[in-house]
Amino acid sequence: MPTLILVRHGQSQWNLENRFTGWWDVDLTEKGVEEAKAAGTLLKEKGVLPTVAFTSFQTRAIKTLHLALEEADRLWIPETKDWRLNERHYGGLTGLDKQEMRDKHGDEQVHIWRRSFDVPPPDMEPGHQYDPGADPRYDGIDVPTTESLKLTIERVLPYWESEILPVLASGETVIISAHGNSLRALVKHLSGISDEDITGLEIPTGQPIIYQFDDRMQPGERYYLKDS
């Protein structure tokens, strides 16, 4: 039975500091490292052992994958990195303190920027100190200046359909180590969650989420591996 494992990266430094992160490359905290290791230990204990891995271009997701795979004795499996699994781009909010933004713009406006389905934050201006456009990992990529969840879905789902789903359909156990919003995009699709309801879905850091697929590649109900 094809099995999909979704893992949001462990706590990052900007998660800890309550800052908008998006495409900026931020490392894991010590807690984030431990969360990633614990995810791998759980995979091993439950016997849910990945055979193929996918992750983003961002360090926090890549490290989470490697730390988890090491704990599960699966560092040797093939892995693919792709920018389309990156976090949602938070535009001009990148690097800013979330509470300071609430104080400045009000809770409602910040909630709309963070959680609405199709309203993106303000664009990132050229020369912004956290502009990832000059990063060599994005050579040849048309880096967005901002993204809503809807726009994030529009890059994640074609990648899922063309690159990940065929691997899963061949019978592999696939692990995807990614980000809160790129994983929300997948969960919305796989679980048939409405545009309205997806805004309330939280993906916790370092907690493996499992989908099992039937012979017609229809996913069952998602569940947290720790609860199985």
UniProtKB/Swiss-Prot annotation:
SMART domains: PGAM. One of its GO terms (molecular function) is phosphoglycerate mutase activity. GO terms for biological process: gluconeogenesis; glycolytic process. PROSITE patterns: PG_MUTASE. It is an enzyme of class 5 (isomerase). This is 2,3-bisphosphoglycerate-dependent phosphoglycerate mutase. It catalyses: (2R)-2-phosphoglycerate = (2R)-3-phosphoglycerate. Homodimer. Its EC number is 5.4.2.11.
